């Protein structure tokens, strides 16, 4: 594995670690990168598989500007994810990451990347359908989003 020296990004540390560098440099994490618009049981199911194996999760929220497909700010999304996992006592760290789309992210700096393809029987959950269901005042979406964050999702979508 090659090592690349990089200057510390103080903005990242300030936003994600209160200005302090992380002390978890030797800890291995299962890393999940996404938009989470909103965070739903499909996301939770994948992450829970790693947590059940005793592997802590690092959930990285892509730092994107809100738009029709992304109605929640990065900060709102992070708070919802933190709220859910705090209610469960999960070993989860949530942080933002600059917007990326390449699955190759991290390979160039020597990280070991193990891609995970979810099993086909896990089902497909569409965040777009969840947002549309809320806009249409249809409660079908409630079976797809954990009760601990449902009120936040509705409030943020209806008060934007």
Predicted features, each with a name:
Residues 2-160:
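Nucleotidyltransferase catalytic core that binds NTPs
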